[in-house]
A protein has these predicted regions:
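Glycine-rich phosphate/diphosphate-binding loop of Rossmann-like nucleotide-binding domains
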Residues: 2-40
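Short, ordered loop/turn segments at secondary-structure junctions
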Residues: 11-12, 70-71, 106-109
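Short, well-ordered secondary-structure micro-motifs
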Residues: 18-20, 48-52, 76-80, 113-116
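Generic secondary-structure signature for well-ordered alpha-helical cores
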Residues: 22, 29-33, 52-56, 91, ...
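Short beta->alpha junction loops
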Residues: 37-46, 107
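Short beta-strand segments at enzyme active-site cores
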Residues: 38, 63-68, 100-106
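Glycine-rich phosphate-binding loop
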Residues: 50-89
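C-terminal binding/interaction regions
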Residues: 79-82, 86-134
Length: 134
């Protein structure tokens, strides 16, 4: 039986997230998981809704999901507030579905120099988290 997962990707930093998605696919293969669905959303705020829709539509065929994105540091606390709200929503969804969600969101508060070095570890860790919780 295939262990299917979905991945939700924020498109605001599309170039970086496309790289993260390729790394996530490689890690999924190593972990014996199949990425059966990829959904692109505008940014981190849309991730919880997309996750909810995916699991509601495909829940029986999915063992988990991952999200990939970046929340940069801005000049206000908007990114921090947004990051906290998104993370809480993701945890709530994970608990209500009883399915693991791998968090591959860099930030909040990521400075430009923080992004590059974190792309691979965050992408791979998001997939490994799913595998370890099955």
């Amino acid at each position: 039986m295939s262990k299917n997962i979905a991945v939700v990707c924020g498109s605001y930093h599309k170039k970086e997230i496309e790289l993260m998605l390729e790394l996530a696919k490689d890690q999924a293969d190593k972990e014996g998981l199949t990425i059966s669905q990829v959904v692109w959303v505008p940014g981190a705020m849309e991730v919880p809704l997309a996750l909810n829709r995916i699991v509601n539509a495909n829940g029986e065929s999915l063992v988990g999901a991952a999200c990939l994105g970046i929340i940069e540091k801005g000049q206000t606390q908007h990114g921090l507030a947004m990051g906290q709200a998104v993370l809480k929503s993701i945890i709530d969804l994970q608990l209500s579905w009883n399915k693991p969600i791998g968090l591959g969101i860099i930030g909040p508060g990521a400075e430009p120099e923080h992004i590059g070095p974190r792309l691979e570890p965050h992408a791979r860790a998001a997939i490994s988290a799913i595998s370890s919780m099955l």
